[in-house]
Structures are given as C-alpha cells and as structure tokens.
Amino acid sequence: MEQLSSANTLFTLELFHTLKESSPTGNIFFSPFSISSSLAMVFLGAKGSTAAQLSKTLHFDSVEDIHSCFQSLTAEVSKLGASHTLKLANRLYGEKTYNFLPEFLASTQKMYSADLAAVDFQHASEDARKEINQWVKGQTEGKIPELLAKGVVDSMTKLVLVNAIYFKGIWEEQFMTRETINAPFRLNKKDTKTVKMMYQKKKFPFGYISDLKCKVLEMPYQGGELSMVILLPEDIEDESTGLKKIEEQLTLGKLHEWTKHENLRNIDVHVKLPRFKMEESYILNSNLCCLGVQDLFSSGKADLSGMSGSRDLFVSKIVHKSFVDVNEQGTEAAAATGGIIQVLCEKMPTPQEVFTVDHPFLFFIRHNPTANMIFFGRVCSP
C-alpha cells in the first residue's frame, strides 16, 4: 500500500507540473486517485510498449502486484461507517457488437468492481453519451452533470472507461457562518478581489518551512481519516502568484517531510480561509504524452490486445472533470475520468499562529491511513 501511495504522489506532482504549464496563474483542481485508477484499468489490458509506458509514467513499475494494491486501497479508502462520504465508482462502456476478452472483463470486475455496460456506439452514439453522463451524474450527486461533451464519442468508439469519485466531508472544527466577512484576496502583487473570508481560532496541526517562508496547516474532517492540507507562502514574493518557489521545490520526499504529523505542532491557530468553489475540466492526452504515455493514443501503435485479443483498440481521449466546494461546514468534491530531504526548521514556539489565506495557495485532500492524495489543487482566484 505504501508503494502505491508513493507512486500515486509522484504521478500527482508530475501531472500538476504539466497542468500548470498550460495554466501558469489559473486555478487547478483534479483527482489523481481517480485518474490513476482509470489508467490502471487500461493497464490491465495493455501489452508491450503501451504497457511499459503506462507503467513508467504512473510509477507502477515500483509497485508489486499493482492491481491487488488498487483493490485493497479502494476498499480501504471507501469503506463504510466513516463519518465522511467518499464514493468511488468504475464502469466500462463497450460497443455491444465488439468482442472483449472474458478474462479482461473478469479482471476489471474483480479488481476494480467495474461492470461492462454494452451500448450502441455504432448506431446511437449520442444516446450512449447521454447514458454515460447520466451514470456519472448519479455517482457524483449531480456535481459532474456532463463528463462527455457532444462529439467526444462517435460511431467508431469501442470503449469508454469511466471512473467517478465523490467526497463530502464535515470539518472536525467547523467555521461559524456569523464570523464570515467580505475581505480582500490578493491575486498577485497588484490585483485583489473580494471574497467571503471564513474565520475560526482552534487547535490545528501547524508547521513552517523556513527556507521557503511557507506555512503548513492541516485541517481534519470529522473522523480524522481525511484532512485538507494547505501550503501557504508568507507573502507574494514573485511577479506571479507567489507560489513559484514552492512549486519548483515540490517533490515526493519534501512533500512528505513538510506535511507528516511528526513535523507539525498542534497549536492554537487563527485561521482565515476563503470560501471557494471550483469546477475544472481537462483532456489529459497531451499531459500524459508529455509524461511518456504516447502509444496509447495512436491507432497504429497502441497495444491493448489484453482487452480484445487484437490490436485495433486505442484510447482517443482521456477526459477528467472535477468539482470542489469549500465552506463553513466542510468540503464537497467530485471528479470523474473518462532530492535532499530537509527537516522542518521550527520557528520559536509561540502560543498561537496566524494563518491568513488571503493570497494564492496549494492544497490537497489526503486519506491519512494510507497517505493517499485523493484530490490536489491550486487556488489563485477563489
């Protein structure tokens, strides 16, 4: 499980770097867990260099028995009885006249609980698209109403792999609505906008990364299994969002070091955090190509013969949509996918800290028992 957690975190950071290249100062929000689960289902049917590229990019080559690990991780992350709702769902939509290998269908069912729904892409692709969107909408409590835009599937489509994830968590320490006020949020050194700024003073795990002049705050959700971790520079020091230095330093080792419990102190913190809501949509083909997955998208090169026995399948698009809403009560989020470690240098202990999120920040929602990042985001304009 630890190997898979490290593999997923590495992939998260690498994917984030490709997303910020096309959006240097924009908001970013995605579910790495959803994307890697979806690609793991593709990997199940991939062979040759297609499989090798997927394995290398997703760092599956460092994980023993990858599909069993995903099976255990999914069961652990979405187990019932928790005080939050975290729902994961996988489904395959296949052209009804196409012969998929029974072994492939049995494996996706066993490892990913993904059923095959037979649809008529050939003669009724628009109906199939609507059916897929309707299913995703239901799985994400209506937050992702249209995963697939018109024209994304057509009569040539053979297979659509869908992964949907929905999360709703209540803060362990909720903000009081009466404390929320209008306040300025600095987008960069020059521009500001007015946001709804929430406030509370409670004990939270807090840390400080001195060489980056960056504060770290962990805000647990009820039950403690999931937390939101926020990385906030003390100030905007570059000519952009103020996040450049942190983003350049983001590595698996450093992120683990900065945010692990032993390096955070539980102290009184005055937290000011804006309410924010984001909806993002990505077609990930070019991002994954940049990271080394190339054959998968090419009709002449893709080898998905583990799915069908022949080499006529390829992936035309990987679509990912995500939604997050952070407010006084907690967080609602959904998504669907079609170096040298430096120890924290603590500041002199003070009885309380101020954590005012009035400029761009990074955050992620982590499943603590498995150390897996379920969602990752950058807020430049709440």
From Swiss-Prot:
SMART domains tied to this protein: SERPIN
Main location class: cytoplasm
Tissue spec: Expressed in brain with lower expression in lung, spleen and testis.
UniProt-listed InterPro entries: Serpin_CS (IPR023795), Serpin_dom (IPR023796), Serpin_fam (IPR000215), Serpin_sf (IPR036186), Serpin_sf_1 (IPR042178), Serpin_sf_2 (IPR042185)
Keyword NADP: no
Residues marked Reactive bond (site): 347-348
Organism: Mus musculus
Cell compartment(s), UniProt: Cytoplasm
Purpose: Regulates the activity of the neutrophil proteases. Forms only a stable complex with CTSG/Cathepsin G. During inflammation, limits the activity of inflammatory caspases CASP1 and CASP4 by suppressing their caspase-recruitment domain (CARD) oligomerization and enzymatic activation.
Protein name, as recorded: Leukocyte elastase inhibitor B
Family annotation (Pfam families): Serpin
Region (CARD-binding motif (CBM)): 352-382
